[in-house]
């Protein structure tokens, strides 16, 4: 496999280039085969890179983009008012062959709209979905959508399930178990969209559909792919991250309560460090946009250096597996592909996506 080349929107996120550039350079140093394209205000990026004299400049390129998309900007403004934004230029690097993937911590709605306009969707796909892996009692579970589509008809949930199954297969899962997130496992439970999606999935030959799953079943590892709309998925993801942080803090506080507790804590320190590492949301940062004719990974806007590095690693993994090609090869098995891009509708029609 050729060395992965990843375009970085260096101006996005809550912390901007002062976090993203050092994180990117650290990732570059840790991965000898990796090549990065930093996109943003070139004079500032050069200054930040100069603070790291050991950087292998043969594997680093800086592309100027004088404009930036703010975290509270509406997608329509990003699409029509900023033709030289770092987000757009990074996506254009993928479209034009200068990079194989794009990573951004910027505004989610703007990234979705720009990605659909610049890269287009795969034939048969109406809208891309954001997917990430969540830890369970067993192997990690893929959850989608995570906020790119807050309202989803049944057909879109069906498409998400297909894309999630293909993504799970690319990670080595055989016949991945697919489930719809619902308020109960009984067939009578759920809203109309979920019930209609279930009917579609039950008829899908070649898809290992297991029915409805509740939130606790996800963490028990009862499915390899869990599908929901972006409204539910975004709340579930961020609630899970908050819960993980609280649990780690509670455990650490317990071992500081007394001298005896501190002694026990010192003995258990290796296990505590392992628990903290396994529950650390940063290592799961980076949601892939499935359904595009190119690879795009969204980092949390609030991610620190470790989280952003995880998003870069996710992009490199997607490049290795060539997810768009795998999806393109499999879509016709599950629904009619008519050759249209699936992305010709007005990408600014919905401005209500979450910003991070």
UniProtKB/Swiss-Prot annotation:
InterPro entries: FA_synthesis, Phospholipid_synth_PlsX-like. Pfam families: FA_synthesis. One of its GO terms (cellular component) is cytoplasm. Pathway: Lipid metabolism; phospholipid metabolism. SUPFAM superfamilies: Isocitrate/Isopropylmalate dehydrogenase-like. It comes from the Bacteria. It is an enzyme of class 2 (transferase). One of its GO terms (molecular function) is phosphate:acyl-[acyl carrier protein] acyltransferase activity. It is found in: Cytoplasm. The keyword Plastid does not apply. It catalyses: a fatty acyl-[ACP] + phosphate = an acyl phosphate + holo-[ACP]. Its main location: cytoplasm. One of its GO terms (biological process) is fatty acid biosynthetic process. The keyword Lipid biosynthesis applies. Keywords: Cytoplasm, Lipid biosynthesis, Lipid metabolism, Phospholipid biosynthesis, Phospholipid metabolism, Transferase. Its EC number is 2.3.1.274. PANTHER family: FATTY ACID/PHOSPHOLIPID SYNTHESIS PROTEIN PLSX, PHOSPHATE ACYLTRANSFERASE. Belongs to the PlsX family. Homodimer. Probably interacts with PlsY. Catalyzes the reversible formation of acyl-phosphate (acyl-PO(4)) from acyl-[acyl-carrier-protein] (acyl-ACP). This enzyme utilizes acyl-ACP as fatty acyl donor, but not acyl-CoA. This is Phosphate acyltransferase. The gene is plsX.
């Amino acid at each position: 496999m050729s060395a992965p080349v990843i375009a970085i929107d260096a101006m996005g996120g809550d912390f901007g280039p002062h976090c993203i550039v050092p994180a990117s350079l650290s990732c570059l140093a840790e991965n000898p085969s990796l090549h990065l394209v930093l996109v943003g205000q070139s004079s500032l990026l050069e200054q930040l890179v100069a603070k790291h004299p050991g950087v292998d400049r043969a594997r680093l390129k800086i592309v100027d983009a004088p404009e930036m998309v703010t975290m509270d900007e509406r997608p329509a403004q990003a699409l029509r008012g900023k033709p030289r934004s770092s987000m757009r230029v990074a996506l254009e690097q993928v479209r034009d062959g200068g990079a194989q993937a794009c990573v951004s911590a910027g505004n989610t709605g703007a990234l979705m709209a720009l990605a659909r306009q610049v890269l287009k969707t795969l034939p048969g796909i109406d809208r891309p979905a954001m997917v990430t892996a969540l830890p369970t009692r067993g192997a990690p579970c893929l959850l989608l959508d995570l906020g790119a589509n807050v309202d989803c008809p049944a057909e879109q949930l069906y498409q998400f399930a297909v894309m999630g199954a293909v993504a799970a297969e690319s990670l080595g899962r055989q016949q991945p178990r697919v489930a719809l997130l619902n308020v109960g496992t009984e067939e009578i439970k759920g809203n109309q969209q979920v019930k209609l999606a279930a009917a579609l999935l039950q008829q899908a030959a070649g898809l290992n559909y297991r029915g409805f799953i509740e939130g606790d079943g996800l963490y028990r590892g009862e499915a390899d792919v869990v599908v929901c709309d972006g409204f539910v998925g975004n709340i579930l993801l961020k609630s899970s991250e908050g819960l993980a942080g609280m649990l780690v803090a509670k455990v650490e506080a317990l071992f500081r309560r007394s001298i005896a507790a501190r002694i026990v804590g010192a003995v258990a320190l290796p296990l505590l460090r392992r628990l903290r590492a396994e529950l650390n949301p940063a290592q799961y940062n980076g949601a892939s946009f499935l359904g595009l004719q190119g690879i795009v990974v969204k980092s949390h806007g609030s991610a620190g250096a470790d989280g952003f590095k995880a998003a870069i690693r996710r992009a490199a993994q997607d490049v290795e597996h060539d997810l768009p090609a795998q999806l393109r090869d499999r879509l016709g098995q599950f629904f009619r592909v008519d050759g249209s891009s699936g992305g010709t509708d007005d990408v600014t029609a919905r401005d209500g996506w979450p910003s991070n």
